[in-house]
């Protein structure tokens, strides 16, 4: 049974990606003019 492991990896990647996007958006919201962004 490889499906549970595969689905777990996919969910983990999705969570990490969303967390990274929210973190970047939060930093950009807190300091909008830093590093030309």
Curated annotation (Swiss-Prot):
The encoding gene: petG
Protein name: Cytochrome b6-f complex subunit 5
Domain of life: Bacteria
SUPFAM superfamilies documented for this protein: PetG subunit of the cytochrome b6f complex (SSF103446)
InterPro entries membership: Cyt_6/f_cplx_su5, Cyt_6/f_cplx_su5_sf
Membrane topology per record: Single-pass membrane protein
Assembly description: The 4 large subunits of the cytochrome b6-f complex are cytochrome b6, subunit IV (17 kDa polypeptide, PetD), cytochrome f and the Rieske protein, while the 4 small subunits are PetG, PetL, PetM and PetN. The complex functions as a dimer.
Gene Ontology terms: cellular component: cytochrome b6f complex; plasma membrane-derived thylakoid membrane
Keyword field: Electron transport, Membrane, Photosynthesis, Thylakoid, Transmembrane, Transmembrane helix, Transport
Family statement: Belongs to the PetG family.
Intracellular or extracellular location(s): Cellular thylakoid membrane
Pfam family, any one: PetG
Main localization, broad class: membrane
GO terms for MF: electron transporter, transferring electrons within cytochrome b6/f complex of photosystem II activity
Keyword Transport (UniProt): yes
Role according to the record: Component of the cytochrome b6-f complex, which mediates electron transfer between photosystem II (PSII) and photosystem I (PSI), cyclic electron flow around PSI, and state transitions. PetG is required for either the stability or assembly of the cytochrome b6-f complex.
Organism placement in taxonomy: Bacteria, Bacillati, Cyanobacteriota, Cyanophyceae, Nostocales
Residue spans crossing the bilayer: 5-25
Any Gene Ontology biological process: cytochrome complex assembly
